[in-house]
Curated annotation (Swiss-Prot):
<comment type="function">
    <text>AP-1 family transcription factor that controls the differentiation of CD8(+) thymic conventional dendritic cells in the immune system. Acts via the formation of a heterodimer with JUN family proteins that recognizes and binds DNA sequence 5'-TGA[CG]TCA-3' and regulates expression of target genes. Required for development of CD8-alpha(+) classical dendritic cells (cDCs) and related CD103(+) dendritic cells that cross-present antigens to CD8 T-cells and produce interleukin-12 (IL12) in response to pathogens.</text>
</comment>
<feature type="modified residue" description="Phosphoserine">
    <location>
        <position position="24"/>
    </location>
</feature>
<feature type="modified residue" description="Phosphoserine">
    <location>
        <position position="2"/>
    </location>
</feature>
<dbReference type="GO" id="GO:0097028">
    <property type="term" value="P:dendritic cell differentiation"/>
</dbReference>
<dbReference type="GO" id="GO:0000978">
    <property type="term" value="F:RNA polymerase II cis-regulatory region sequence-specific DNA binding"/>
</dbReference>
<feature type="region of interest" description="Disordered">
    <location>
        <begin position="1"/>
        <end position="69"/>
    </location>
</feature>
<dbReference type="GO" id="GO:0005654">
    <property type="term" value="C:nucleoplasm"/>
</dbReference>
<keyword id="KW-0539">Nucleus</keyword>
<dbReference type="GO" id="GO:0090575">
    <property type="term" value="C:RNA polymerase II transcription regulator complex"/>
</dbReference>
<keyword id="KW-0238">DNA-binding</keyword>
<keyword id="KW-0010">Activator</keyword>
<feature type="domain" description="bZIP">
    <location>
        <begin position="28"/>
        <end position="91"/>
    </location>
</feature>
<dbReference type="GO" id="GO:0005730">
    <property type="term" value="C:nucleolus"/>
</dbReference>
<keyword id="KW-0805">Transcription regulation</keyword>
<dbReference type="GO" id="GO:0005829">
    <property type="term" value="C:cytosol"/>
</dbReference>
<dbReference type="InterPro" id="IPR000837">
    <property type="entry name" value="AP-1"/>
</dbReference>
<feature type="compositionally biased region" description="Basic and acidic residues">
    <location>
        <begin position="51"/>
        <end position="69"/>
    </location>
</feature>
Length: 118
């Protein structure tokens, strides 16, 4: 089993990197605070993104349900239209008002009365 280089902290690597000036503890502290602040901001951003995705998912589900309800209503209304059209067609075959020729020629003042049974 080969051993890798000894574990070195991120701060130590930045100090040991070529071209870097040795940093003061104050600079190190500032860097740690900045990284912590960045980490917290990243967590907040991920949380916000997750919440937004959850909200969109809920809205999608709600719209799907509404769509389903509306499709069922359309189906019922189409069936009702079909039924009422059939009823009307059957009624037209035997309606005395529609069969009366006086409905089409306006000779009297009250053409409906002449078609009604006496």
């Amino acid at each position: 089993m080969s051993q890798g280089p000894p574990a070195v902290s991120v701060l130590q690597r930045s100090v040991d990197a070529p071209g870097n000036q040795p940093q003061s503890p104050k600079d190190d502290d500032r860097k740690v605070r900045r990284r912590e602040k960045n980490r917290v901001a990243a967590q907040r951003s991920r949380k916000k993104q997750t919440q937004k995705a959850d909200k969109l998912h809920e809205e999608h589900e709600s719209l799907e349900q509404e769509n389903s309800v509306l499709r069922r209503e359309i189906s019922k209304l189409k069936e009702e239209l079909r039924h009422l059209s059939e009823v009307l067609k059957e009624h037209e075959k035997m309606c005395p008002l529609l069969l009366c020729p006086m409905n089409f020629v306006q000779l009297r003042s009250d053409p409906v009365a002449s078609c009604l049974p006496r």
